[in-house]
Curated annotation (Swiss-Prot):
Its cofactor is Ca(2+). It is a peripheral membrane protein. Optimum pH is 6.0-7.0. Induction: Strongly up-regulated by lipopolysaccharide (LPS) in brain, heart, liver, colon and testis. Ca(2+) binds at Y47, G49, G51, D68. This is Group IIF secretory phospholipase A2. The active site is at H67, D114. The gene is Pla2g2f. Its EC number is 3.1.1.4. GO terms for biological process: arachidonate metabolic process; arachidonate secretion; innate immune response; lipid catabolic process; negative regulation of T cell proliferation; phosphatidylcholine acyl-chain remodeling; phosphatidylethanolamine acyl-chain remodeling; phosphatidylglycerol acyl-chain remodeling.
Length: 168
């Protein structure tokens, strides 16, 4: 019985993950950047992947910091950006459209956060030296998310980088 329960829990988590925002983000990043999102970006610099600390290492790392802040704002609104599924499509291999099929505001905003990250990653040079970076080496003050406020009107969740990266 215990084995059955463990298998049922595992199967349930796999099914849930299969329809999650993280898989939406993965497909979005891979379609636009043409990089394997897990191998290229999880563990890049101080902020790409889980957690983050210190001063971002480069522009790509700033993109991930902005995305962390965007998700933080969603959590404050009661959203669950890691697990909420949203609908999007890629047009002409370069445009990301968060579709009208997104029913909740959380779905819409999560899609916009992920879209902003993806476009930011596309627009900045990838540096192999920050791939697999151990964030124990990340030093300096952690930038406050308030550097992205207010967000530009045309974009939700901090598209791009702050005009002048500010350490607080």
């Amino acid at each position: 019985m215990k084995k059955f329960f463990a298998i049922a829990v595992l199967a349930g988590s796999v099914v849930t993950t299969a329809h999650s925002s993280l898989l939406n983000l993965k497909s979005m990043v891979e379609a636009i950047t043409h990089r394997n999102s897990i191998l290229s970006f999880v563990g890049y610099g101080c902020y790409c992947g889980l957690g983050g600390r210190g001063h971002p290492m480069d522009e790509v790392d700033w993109c991930c910091h902005a995305h962390d802040c965007c998700y933080e704002k969603l959590f404050e609104q009661g959203c669950r950006p890691y697990v909420d599924h949203y609908d999007h499509r890629i047009e002409n291999g370069t445009m990301i459209v968060c579709t009208e099929l997104n029913e909740t505001e959380c779905d819409k905003q999560t899609c916009e956060c992920d879209k902003s990250l993806t476009l930011c990653l596309k627009d900045h040079p990838y540096r192999n030296k920050y791939r697999g970076y151990f964030n124990v080496y990340c030093q300096g003050p952690t930038p406050n998310c308030s550097i992205y406020d207010p967000y530009p009107e045309e974009v939700t969740c901090g598209h791009g980088l702050p005009a002048t990266p500010v350490s607080t």
